[in-house]
A protein has these predicted regions:
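Extracellular glycan-modifying ectodomains
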Residues: 1-197
Length: 197
């Protein structure tokens, strides 16, 4: 999730320099290595992220992941820690995803002409997690990615090109399209220029 968020933001805002500190299945949350990732390397990677990388001069730290209910409290603790270091934080909220990989859903369809319509019953909406996150961490903006992805509908193709390469990750075109929508929905330059926490 974080890697294609990086791709999305880089394409939407070419005037800014973005860096990423991502690893597959390693949620960027502080001191909760038991849920921060399923691999043993996540623990050392998270220690590096939150002891070394956070000390670099950055205008903003963007946290993006597959957010679940059990990650809200450690995310809150992570935000408090980052604020204590004087860091500005933005959270990319839970995304809509699909019950099956999008290419598989398309292969089951009858034609590309109506695939966006035919997959709508395969959408998994995580807006309830977004509401819980916003309630727990009101001091930080949490972007409603589900609304951005599904404005006005949860399309999986644009013309004849895929927007997702699996259940939840954007293709390059998907990152570009969702980045365009992100830019319209959220004023990142203004957010970055607001006073630090």
């Amino acid at each position: 999730m974080a890697a294609d968020t990086y791709m999305m933001l880089s394409q939407a805002y070419p005037e800014y320099t973005f860096s990423q500190a991502t690893a597959d299945a390693c949620t960027g949350i502080l001191d909760r290595f038991d849920i921060g990732g399923r691999y043993s390397t996540c623990r050392s990677f998270n220690q590096y992220r939150f002891s070394e990388l956070v000390r670099l001069d950055m205008d903003l730290i963007v946290l993006a992941s597959i957010w679940e209910e059990d990650r809200i409290q450690p995310l809150k603790e992570t935000v408090a820690y980052l604020h204590s270091l004087g860091k500005k934080v933005l959270i990319i909220g839970p995304r809509v995803h699909f019950r099956d990989a999008v290419p598989l859903l398309i292969s089951r369809g009858t034609s590309l002409d109506n695939v966006n319509f035919s997959v709508r019953n395969r959408v998994v909406d995580r807006s309830f997690v977004l509401r819980q996150m916003r309630q727990a961490i009101p001091e930080v903006d949490i972007v409603d990615m589900g609304s951005i992805q599904c404005a006005p509908s949860c399309d999986v193709i644009d013309g004849d090109r895929l927007l997702y390469y699996d259940k939840r990750h954007f293709t390059q075109l998907g990152a570009q399209r969702f980045g365009e929508r992100f830019k319209k929905a959220f004023d990142l330059p203004t957010y970055m220029s607001e006073p630090d926490p």
